[in-house]
Amino acid sequence: MGLEKISRIWIPLIGILFCVVDGKSENNFVFEAEKIVSAGIEMPYRVAHTNGLGNPALVIYLHGGSSKGNDNDTQMKEAGIDSIANYLALKKLNAVHLVPQCPSDKSWGGPMLGVLKALIDRHVLSESLDNTDIYIFGGSMGGTGTWSMLSAYPRLFTAAMPVAGNPSKCDADNVATTPVYTVMGTSDRIMSVETASGFIDELNARGAITRLDIEEGWTHEVTCIQSYTTKRLDWIFGHNRNSSGIENPVAEDNIVKSIQYVSLDGRQLSESPCKGFYIERLIYNDGTVASFKIFK
């Protein structure tokens, strides 16, 4: 289950270039730095676009607890991102790949679930991703956050892969609406195999589409690093909205009604600027607003 090699070159102020170096692909793509401000919470994130086949999918990766902060850099060092990015390049999949960074005083739960939803909404709307497939991944705290997103937003995601996470506080009825593949290690001293296995049993009792791999001898760290194999990613990306029976990629209880573009000095803009700093606002049908500080 070794990871396919991928090199990472750090480019200050521009992004992160992922380049497959095993000779199988020439596809390169850059993770550019952006931020979102929603409900008074500022969250940095990275976004990359892969130019591949088919309609673009939205891919989200949630990092573990040791990568929290506001440098928009530390979260990119997790091995799972390399594995997923490499897979997208090798398979020539068309995707928008998001990697948010959780603030140091937060976790992937509570108000951060709403911030993540606003991030998804922003890219679904601004990049015309209506009816797109949305996939979510995460390890450790990010695995727990992935479970929590499935619980908070049923039918939003096409498929999910929470790794070494804790689903104990999640609503099984909601989570059961999404195909899920989870991986746990028997030597994990942080997350409980029994908790994950019991929750999978609850999902199966509700007719959910699930896979659970329990790896003998894997520690928490090893599980977070080695779980994203080609075979498992094939299973995740093999699901689409038609095959999964998912009706609507956006939760119907809070839909984006309009989008506004504003300069940093508060002037309303008629369209998104081609370059420079500006603020993008999503106006929801319940009156709430999510703001994004954008740099092009």
Where are these regions (language model features)?
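Gly/Ser-rich "nucleophile elbow"/oxyanion-hole loop immediately N-terminal to the catalytic nucleophile
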Residues: 51, 105-140
